[in-house]
Amino acid sequence: MSFTQIARSCSRLAATLAPRRVASGILIQSQASRMMHRIAVPSMTSQLSQECRGRWQTQLVRKYSAKPPLSLKLINERVLLVLKLYDKIDPSKLNVESHFINDLGLDSLDHVEVIMAMEDEFGFEIPDSDAEKLLKPADIIKYVADKEDVYE
């Protein structure tokens, strides 16, 4: 391992281990818990003392997926929550079989905004060719379940 690779590894680890603040001021755990492997890196402290600079520690940690498992019920709840929070949808008219255009009165631009909100909620991109077919909350639930391999 070259010095450049070691330096990059150290800076990545330092950035990963630094606690991050969210808007509310609460400290959250950084992505260190999501790392699959850690490599040999120098001991990190706020100020590296002369003693620690030449020493190396090997940390062997293996963690698996940080994503909570999805279920159809959870996908259903999340889709309906996102739609209820959309200001152009009347929550009293909303159910899983409501058609976005015919029942809820949305136009094509609103439909695009709904699809973008679903992309943000579930963390993956929905291609335009697929988005055109998602005209009901039930269609979105089925699409997300298929994409995330959720079968019940």
From Swiss-Prot:
Main location group: mitochondrion
Output the Gene Ontology cellular-component terms: mitochondrial [2Fe-2S] assembly complex; mitochondrial inner membrane; mitochondrion; respiratory chain complex I
What this chain does, per the record?
A: Carrier of the growing fatty acid chain in fatty acid biosynthesis. Accessory and non-catalytic subunit of the mitochondrial membrane respiratory chain NADH dehydrogenase (Complex I), which functions in the transfer of electrons from NADH to the respiratory chain.
Annotated Carrier domain residues: 73-148
Which NCBIfam families does the record associate with it? PRK00982.1-2
Which keywords does this Swiss-Prot/TrEMBL entry list?
Electron transport, Fatty acid biosynthesis, Fatty acid metabolism, Lipid biosynthesis, Lipid metabolism, Mitochondrion, Phosphopantetheine, Phosphoprotein, Respiratory chain, Transit peptide, Transport
Protein name as catalogued: Acyl carrier protein, mitochondrial
Chain positions found as O-(pantetheine 4'-phosphoryl)serine: 108
**What species was this sequence derived from?**
Drosophila melanogaster
Corresponding gene?
Answer: ND-ACP
